[in-house]
């Protein structure tokens, strides 16, 4: 036992004693899940428990069954959003959108059974056999850079994609009208990357429409396979028509010669669309433009029948795709017209195409630029035109990465006995929708709980209504206990991109409650629409916080421990803490129930503070009275010092069963395995100086006069520890874990690299303390300016060099690392440029 730990256990601080009653009888004690009414399912299950015990059945088995049932039961609190909130009747402006972030370009409706559209392309004749077909964003497909130049999150976007010798520009604009979400139009332009090239390639563009149910598509095909239009009808869209207009040269109106192939079949399943098209590109055709030599190309067979129609194809949906093959440069427009929009006026609306489409696109682009400057004021703050372009791309990439998902996740229930969860079979969560931004279109095209709070800090500055929509959907995922899964893998398309072993979410695992960061901003701004939303959201926010506070409780009052560290993996240098979001950040070398995690305690303190202030503002006296004492106890300096200040290290730290004497050594045939030397592990503070050490500062939990603030600023500003020319590194360069692999196949992740989300928190904290009177005010302000220059400057240089925002950045040379594009929390660079914290 570490020096001083015996004293702490025997004589807890008065603040800890005072808080124990609130902490252990605190939020949600009345019904175990945040004060909300019990669900009907919960009541029935409880009755079964009582009856089973009366009949002599095993109480432990029944309790496990009861907990398993609650894990996949939706919470009973009133929903924040109505059930039809995504319908065209309630939100027509959001019904259609680029809600398929994993494809290079596509749109769909916000519906459990959506109508989907998309684009594929291939350059003919560059490689033997089937040409490289581009459709879904992939990390290693060689495409790039790519990303949205403009995207307003609602009705307009312009994206540029570089693919070898090709440069594609995809644009869309929506036009409101009618009762079904209005009209929209695309323009896809393909030009040579090198304007001076003489050998212009032959390119095939594939425009497709997919239905996901019994909806009907009726194509009208003209001579030589040219699709004139597609008419259709669905219950949500009414009557509609798609039209693929004849191709032209960019900026011209004269039609350009193209070769056409059309294919119509049953929907094979959304994850299989790419492979189906690849497999059908097996017939040779001749492209014969007038006055030019013919060229061969691989095309789709001209099937116009609905294949597999019958018992096996009923209700499967349809897949209709038009291939257009021609020489670049080209521009093609694809138009969707809603029947109700056309019928809504006294005269038919002109088609949103040609010069009318050009005018609409330019008008929206100019409106975006003006709104962007008015919102973020980068030009006024003196940032260069290039940095302003970076800011626009950061915002647009985040908004263009918003997706709509629907499906059932797999949940492994918490049966209440730690370590036994693997003995329980996973169960399906109820079908739920999710409207969310994603971290990365190529690598993480789905919802992540702790990422989303950072995403919405950016989104809400631009469009608060989008943030309300996203938060409402996330809170709709709450189960009966108040748990939200940290990774949402909903629907076939999302599931197809995740290895099977990672599909299951464990109901005992938490995640940092970052959704409270945009909630705190809403409360600070005080917009009436936000406050009305928060009034509806409070019961679910309360339930979610109560679950976190209770389920992750640590060994001592006011201490907390991330569940989910696996001690039984001999190949890991340090067992991961995935629920914390910091994955391989070094914790106690030997996981145990004695651990106390500093970052988690700080997150709980932030949650208690935000929800107390929210309850007070809304006049919810009962919630405020319940959470207020807990918030005060968690923010008390004595309590934080008692549990997490490590005098021998001079910083705040985790506590647990730990030794530094661990290393990976080769042990054939196992490969690298962990070897523990001397000294043997003992209960002590964990000497891993890094992001975790800063959390009391990052979340602004310290008083500006605190004696602990100075030492934290010291390590933050020390280049031997966390300071680098490119931002704060995640783990001190002086740490024995710095830059170390966690296993043979697991390179360092949170062990030195610079991450934008934590650097943004650090900038906000330094800005905060730099504006509060205290002994460290001037130093905090100076460090803020220097850190901001380092972070913004490096992201800008890497964007110039690569065209991408990256997941993380090297603390050694600043280069982008990890996956790209990463317009998730790296988009926080925009708020750093705007000095908006």
From Swiss-Prot:
- What GO terms in the biological process aspect are recorded for it? oligosaccharide metabolic process; protein folding; protein N-linked glycosylation; viral protein processing
Active site (catalytic residues): 583, 807
Compositional bias annotation for Basic and acidic residues: 17-33
- The keyword Signal appears for this protein: no
Protein's cellular compartments: Endoplasmic reticulum membrane
Stretches the record annotates as Required for endoplasmic reticulum targeting = 76-137
Q: Which residues lie on this side of the membrane: Lumenal?
A: 60-837
| Alphabetic keyword roster | Disease variant, Endoplasmic reticulum, Glycoprotein, Glycosidase, Hydrolase, Membrane, Signal-anchor, Transmembrane, Transmembrane helix
Q: A Gene Ontology MF term for this entry?
A: glucosidase activity
**Membrane topology summary:** Single-pass type II membrane protein
What EC number(s) has UniProt assigned to this enzyme? Answer: 3.2.1.106
- Pathway the protein takes part in: Glycan metabolism; N-glycan degradation
Where does it sit, as one GO cellular component term? membrane
Q: Which residues lie on this side of the membrane: Cytoplasmic?
A: 1-38
Q: What is its main location?
A: endoplasmic reticulum
Glycosylated positions are: 657
- Transmembrane segments in this chain: where? 39-59
The protein's superkingdom reads Eukaryota
| SUPFAM superfamilies reported for this sequence | Six-hairpin glycosidases
- Report the disease annotation for this entry: Type IIb congenital disorder of glycosylation: Characterized by marked generalized hypotonia and hypomotility of the neonate, dysmorphic features, including a prominent occiput, short palpebral fissures, retrognathia, high arched palate, generalized edema, and hypoplastic genitalia. Symptoms of the infant included hepatomegaly, hypoventilation, feeding problems and seizures. The clinical course was progressive and the infant did not survive more than a few months.
Q: Which family does it belong to?
A: Belongs to the glycosyl hydrolase 63 family.
Q: What is the protein's name according to its record?
A: Mannosyl-oligosaccharide glucosidase
User: Which gene carries the instructions for this protein?
Assistant: MOGS
């Amino acid at each position: 036992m570490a020096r001083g730990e015996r004293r702490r256990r025997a004589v807890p601080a008065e603040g800890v004693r005072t808080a124990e009653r609130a902490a252990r009888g605190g939020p949600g004690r009345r019904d175990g899940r945040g004060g909300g009414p019990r669900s009907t399912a919960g009541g029935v299950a409880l009755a079964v428990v009582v009856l089973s015990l009366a009949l002599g059945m095993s109480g432990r088995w029944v309790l496990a069954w009861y907990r398993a049932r609650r894990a996949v039961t939706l919470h009973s609190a009133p929903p924040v959003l109505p059930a039809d909130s995504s319908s065209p009747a309630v939100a027509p402006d959001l019904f259609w959108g680029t809600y398929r972030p994993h494809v290079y370009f596509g749109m769909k409706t916000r519906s459990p059974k959506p109508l989907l559209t998309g684009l594929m392309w291939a350059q003919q004749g560059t490689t033997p056999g089937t040409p490289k077909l581009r459709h879904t964003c992939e990390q290693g497909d060689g495409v790039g850079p790519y990303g949205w130049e403009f995207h307003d999150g609602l009705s307009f976007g312009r994206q540029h994609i570089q693919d070898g010798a090709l440069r594609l520009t995809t644009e869309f604009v929506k036009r409101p009208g009618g009762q079904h979400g209005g009209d929209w139009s695309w323009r896809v332009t393909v030009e040579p990357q090198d304007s001076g090239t003489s050998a212009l390639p032959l390119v095939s563009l594939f425009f497709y429409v997919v239905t996901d149910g019994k909806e009907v598509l009726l194509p009208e095909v003209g001579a030589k396979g040219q699709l004139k239009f597609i008419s259709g009808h669905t219950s949500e869209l009414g009557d509609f028509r798609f039209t693929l207009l004849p191709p032209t040269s960019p900026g011209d109106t004269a039609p350009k010669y193209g070769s056409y192939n059309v294919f119509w079949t049953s929907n094979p399943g959304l994850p299989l669309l790419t492979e189906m098209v690849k497999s059908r590109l097996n017939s040779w055709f001749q492209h014969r433009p007038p006055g030019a030599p013919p060229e061969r190309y691989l095309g789709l067979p001209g099937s116009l029948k609905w294949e597999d129609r019958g018992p096996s194809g009923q209700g499967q949906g349809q897949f209709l795709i038009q291939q257009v093959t021609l020489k670049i440069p080209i521009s093609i427009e694809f138009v969707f017209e809603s029947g109700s929009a056309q019928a809504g006026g006294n005269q038919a609306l002109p088609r949103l195409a040609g010069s009318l489409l050009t005018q609409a696109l330019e008008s929206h682009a100019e409106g975006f630029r003006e709104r962007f400057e008015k919102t973020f004021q980068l030009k006024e703050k003196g940032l260069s035109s290039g940095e302003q372009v970076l800011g626009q791309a950061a915002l647009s990439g985040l908004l263009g990465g918003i997706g709509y998902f629907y499906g059932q996740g797999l949940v492994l229930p918490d049966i209440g006995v730690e370590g036994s969860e693997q003995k329980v079979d996973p169960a399906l969560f109820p079908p739920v929708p999710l409207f969310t931004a994603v971290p990365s279109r190529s690598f993480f095209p789905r919802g992540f709980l702790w990422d989303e709070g950072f995403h919405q800090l950016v989104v809400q500055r631009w469009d608060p209504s989008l943030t309300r929509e996203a938060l409402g959907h996330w809170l709709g995922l709450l189960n009966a206990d108040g748990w939200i899964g940290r990774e949402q893998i909903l629907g076939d398309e999302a599931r197809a991109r995740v290895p099977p072993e990672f599909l299951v979410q464990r109901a005992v695992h938490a995640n940092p409650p970052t959704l409270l960061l945009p909630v705190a901003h809403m409360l600070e701004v005080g917009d009436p629409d936000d406050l009305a939303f928060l009034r509806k959201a409070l019961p679910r926010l309360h339930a979610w916080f109560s679950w976190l506070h209770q389920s992750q409780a640590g060994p001592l009052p006011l201490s907390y421990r991330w569940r989910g560290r696996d001690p039984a993996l001999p190949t890991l240098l340090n067992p991961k803490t995935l629920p914390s979001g910091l994955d391989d950040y070094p914790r106690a070398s030997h996981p145990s129930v004695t651990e106390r995690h500093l970052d988690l305690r700080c997150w709980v303190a932030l949650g208690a503070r935000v929800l107390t202030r929210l309850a007070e503002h809304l006049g919810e006296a009962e919630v405020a009275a319940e959470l207020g004492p807990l918030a005060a106890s968690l923010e008390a300096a004595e309590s934080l010092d008692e549990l997490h200040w490590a005098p021998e290290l001079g910083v705040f730290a985790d506590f647990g069963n730990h030794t530094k004497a661990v290393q990976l050594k080769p042990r054939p045939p196992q490969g690298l395995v962990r070897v523990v030397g001397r000294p043997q592990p003992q209960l002590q503070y964990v000497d891993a100086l890094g992001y975790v050490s800063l959390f009391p500062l990052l979340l602004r939990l310290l008083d500006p006069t605190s004696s602990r603030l100075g030492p934290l600023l010291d390590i933050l500003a020390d280049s031997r520890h966390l300071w680098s020319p490119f931002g704060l590194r995640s783990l001190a360069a002086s740490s024995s874990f710095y830059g170390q692999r966690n296993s043979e196949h697991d390179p360092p992740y949170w062990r030195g690299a610079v991450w934008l989300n934590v650097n943004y928190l650090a900038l906000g904290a330094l800005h905060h303390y730099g504006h509060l009177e205290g002994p460290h005010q001037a130093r905090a302000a100076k460090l803020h300016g220097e850190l901001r220059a380092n972070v913004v400057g490096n992201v800008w240089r890497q964007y110039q060099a690569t065209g991408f925002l990256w997941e993380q950045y090297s603390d050694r040379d600043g280069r982008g690392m990890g996956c790209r594009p990463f317009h998730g929390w790296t988009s926080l660079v925009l708020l750093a440029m705007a000095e908006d914290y």
